[in-house]
Amino acid sequence: MPLCDPGERQPGGSPVRIGALAPLTRPGWAEAGRHLLAGLELAVRDVNDAGGIVGRPLELVVRDTAADPRRAATAVDELAGLGVAAVAGEYHSVVARAAAVRADALGLPFLCSSAVLDALTEQPTPWVARLAPPQSRGWRLYADFLLSEGHSRIAVATEPSVYWASGARVLRDRLAPYGGTVVELDMRALTPAAVCDELADHRATALLLLVGHPEPAVPIVESVRRDRRLAGMTIGAPAGQPEFAGWATSLGEDGAGIPFLRYLPERLTPLGARVGTSLRERLAEAPSFVAFEGYDTVAVLAGVLRSSGADRTRTAASWPCVAVEGTRGPIRFSRVPGISVWQWGGAPIQVVDRDPAQPGRFRVLRTG
């Protein structure tokens, strides 16, 4: 049974510490990590300005995962030894999975901010919760978008990864009943120019980038855009690479008109609007959905910690009791079939792209 009643609380005293995981250096997607950390830090500031955790200041203990699962698992061990009340964050799915497995083994609450891989743990766990929607939900919506645009012959440029393989499987399973096919192009064996040859040979109408950014995503886009045989070819990036300013800086107009997934609602909540303004000031650029995920993560944990007294067991038992007004809507966790962690079932999903006429502006193409 969940422990939804407040535990014994002791006002004042030493800081309540939360471990924060984020990719802050290469080969991690450091731009995403910077946005995630900005959201986490802003929320901590707001929590402390409002009195902290029953008078105790909230403090982040940040660790750079650098897209390395082993480094993430080691960080979770270290943070547990430092006495953190919970661990939060992470962007890369495979890294988050390593962190989740270790947190589960240690009995340490982990609120995953951004990673979408369905199977964060092999077995159901009471210790882990997640804000981002599972990959199966988001990528099915993306497949539906492709079908609505008339695409049935899809090519995916892919690299070895559980995350990319899982995404390709979701796409294939969703497209197959409608006669759609998915051809995988192994980027270990192909140059960007060779990708263009494969696309022409397979008569694909859409190429999806299931690869890292900037390499090899950027040179693939540049090659496809310049190949006359592929005029009109749709390029897609379901993992969200075009969300960040670095994409536009690298590709300019070539990076526009590439649909991707992001996790924002049509309208932010009043809290979200205020937070968005503060994040823009902090980042000196428009905040991505990842920054809002970071903020919501701390907002949820602060509410849980106020009632649990920073006790790890009570914190984990409180996931089903969460009722927080986040930046993107009301947040509650439930058990979702096929998902091993506590899941926010109402996380918003959009398919968007950068407007070719104005690459700094996003167009919403589909919601779900």
Question: How would you describe each model-predicted region?
Answer:
Residues 1-368:
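Extracytosolic ligand-binding ectodomains
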